[in-house]
Each structure stands twice: as C-alpha cells, then as structure tokens.
Amino acid sequence: MSDLGQLAEKLAGALGPALTERKLAVGELTLTVAADRILDVLALLRDDPDCDFKILVDLCGNDWPRRGKRFDVVYHLLSLTRNMRIRVKVLVGEGEAIKSCIALYPAAGWFEREAFDMYGIAFENNPDLRRILTDYGFSGYPLRKDFPLTGYVEVRYDDELKRVVYQPVQLVQEFRDFDFMSPWEGAPHIMPDGGKAASGNPGKKA
C-alpha cells in the first residue's frame, strides 16, 4: 500500500476507538491516538505488512499551555519499503506519564530523554530517564512556553575560583518589545486550501 489516503482508511478501521483524529494534508498523514493505546498503535504500524514503519525517525514534544492536555508527544515514522512517512500524536496532561516505546523502537531511548529534559514529560519503563541536554542540576524545562527565554541562571568560568560558577542572569540591556509586523517579506507559506500565500509584504497597507 503506497497511497496515504488508502492507508488512512485502513488504519481508521484497524485502530477503531484508539484513533481519535486523522488528518491528511499537504501530503502528510497525522494520526492522533489515545495515550493508553500508543504501544498497540506503534506495534501495528511497525508489524503490519501494509504499513511496515520499521524506523522511528524522531520523537519530540510540543507545549500548548492553555489546553487541558498540555503536551503533544509526536512520533515520526518511516517505511523504507513503502517509501512513506507517518506522524503519530498523543496528548498528555501535565504530571501524566506515557508508556515508553523502547521495546518497539530502541532508538526512542534518547528521544524520550530529550522530551523529558525539555518538557518534563515522563516515560514509563524508560530504563535511563535522565536529563540529556541541560547542565547538571538544571531546574525547569526550557521548551515549555512559560519558561523565560533567558533562563534563570547563567554559567561562566570564574578565573579567580578556577571553576565554573552559576549566577543569576544579568542582561546587558532591558527586554525590548516589538509590536509591529516584520518589514521583510516572508516565504510563500502553504495555505490550508493547498494554495500559496499572496505575494507582497503583509506588513504594508495599500
């Protein structure tokens, strides 16, 4: 099966209530599934011969602070035999844990650690769920929308103490708020109807 539309129909029937939403747009298929069924869904996508998504390309998080289920956990899968990609998304609330998929995709180990480090999303049964990108003793989750852009502390080498020290962030200048549109013309973005954005500078009025 090499057509994403046909695959979407097949998966809708196979997954049943586990599939809460499906979207096929701009040549990409995205499935939103129930968090408690994520391992069943991933196993089907990996093992079904019509799917054959053997490779986990990436696993990442996303933060929507105003939403009840604050976080997305997004799995990007690749089938080399079918030459297809698929995106699987799960909604997770703050403080909730999601099952690790290491048993299905061993490459998920470090991806899950990164999502934990950046967003605080916990993965059950990950054998080594430690921070992976931030410094030792780091506090907070840098990719959450409510985390300050500057962070809380800065790290520098103190030549007198001959060691690395932490200290509160000291800004060279105060924050500046830019409340106007960019004067530069952006790239022609793909619109929901599949067309292109109108050319010209959206920041200028006729």
Name these PLM-found stretches.
Residues 1-206:
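Terminal low-complexity/charged segments
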